[in-house]
Amino acid sequence: MGIMMMILGLLVIIVCLCTALLRWNQMRYSKKGLPPGTMGWPIFGETTEFLKQGPDFMKNQRLRYGSFFKSHILGCPTIVSMDAELNRYILMNESKGLVAGYPQSMLDILGTCNIAAVHGPSHRLMRGSLLSLISPTMMKDHLLPKIDDFMRNYLCGWDDLETVDIQEKTKHMAFLSSLLQIAETLKKPEVEEYRTEFFKLVVGTLSVPIDIPGTNYRSGVQARNNIDRLLTELMQERKESGETFTDMLGYLMKKEDNRYLLTDKEIRDQVVTILYSGYETVSTTSMMALKYLHDHPKALEELRREHLAIRERKRPDEPLTLDDIKSMKFTRAVIFETSRLATIVNGVLRKTTHDLELNGYLIPKGWRIYVYTREINYDTSLYEDPMIFNPWRWMEKSLESKSYFLLFGGGVRLCPGKELGISEVSSFLHYFVTKYRWEENGEDKLMVFPRVSAPKGYHLKCSPY
């Protein structure tokens, strides 16, 4: 009996302590002028609930507090915005104190000069440098021929395989395609070394920044250091060779006729940015497009008709051109609808540089603002039957210009590689649907939060078309 009373007393103390901690944390952030919301536990906030419940957490908070509320997620006090017009304002007004505010682990691993970390003149320099690498002329003369050659060869022989894990294949595809555009002279062992380190880096960017052995963060930092070493060695070799290279690294290192001269560190950060920024969006969009096309035969029929018409105009070995990519209207619609329905990117983070008024509330300096776009993608007032895969909705070009179109970010942070990414996915779909028919091999489950993935892979059986 005595032991039971002790246990009961201990439980009461724990409950009281937890309640007190929750109340204390809520009072810490109950400043006058803040939007409504809850802050969860000290230090951890509501991150656990956010990651565990995902979209349901956001839906519940929206029902309780509206489309603009406070929380404590991703390691810091955060304002969540789900209002389409307000989101556009936030993204369009970096100069008013709404700068990029990505998690510390991402900034540490991607580098202090990466395009997501800098703003003002530094951002203009890095963005200008990146845009010069993927201009229409560069796309036409250099990038697209390399992408086409890579996709044509990468997709060969899949019908000889018992099963194809599309998730694994598209991840490797996105990474290898980018790496070969950056440094086309790399040998296979060098490519494998980059690949091994890069996949560790990706995991590290989405980890808690605890720098102790065994953590994903430590592994990510070490992977970034190893990639820096590999890049430094490659850049030194190129400097000593005196040769001219026409890949992205060659243009970044070019001293003559280069408006955007970067330091060696800025070049390394730019290379990692190029590898990282397109990796998940290109790979996941490619995988999910095949999933939706499999489930919607009419959409697949329309897409295949578009690509077969292009092939009929060409010799068997003739590559895709930029004009071909531009002519793929339905393919572009499939890519947009896949990005919307799967919500490849859940939102965008901003940070306040000073106390500022927003939506009638006073947001303190240093708080993050999470422009949460997932709910907007499924808003019935914006999209008819939003839970249905309907690429035809995007054939109306004006939909891309709507204020709530944030699939690629917005404002000065609009994804600079948008058209390059679309070209890569379009090329992948072109060669896949003209080479193969496919069926799902098993009942693989897909997760949609915190990132779209197939925990055990997404397996297909391919046969010749």
Swiss-Prot record:
Compartmental location: Membrane; Endoplasmic reticulum
GO molecular function: brassinolide synthase activity; heme binding; iron ion binding; monooxygenase activity
Chain sites annotated for binding heme: C415
Lipid modification (S-farnesyl cysteine), residues: C462
Motif (Farnesylation CAAX motif): 462-465
Keywords noted in UniProt: Brassinosteroid biosynthesis, Endoplasmic reticulum, Heme, Iron, Lipid biosynthesis, Lipid metabolism, Lipoprotein, Membrane, Metal-binding, Monooxygenase, Oxidoreductase, Prenylation, Steroid biosynthesis, Transmembrane, Transmembrane helix
Domain of life: Eukaryota
Family the entry assigns: Belongs to the cytochrome P450 family.
Name of the protein described by the UniProt record: Cytochrome P450 85A2
Species lineage: Eukaryota, Viridiplantae, Streptophyta, Embryophyta, Tracheophyta
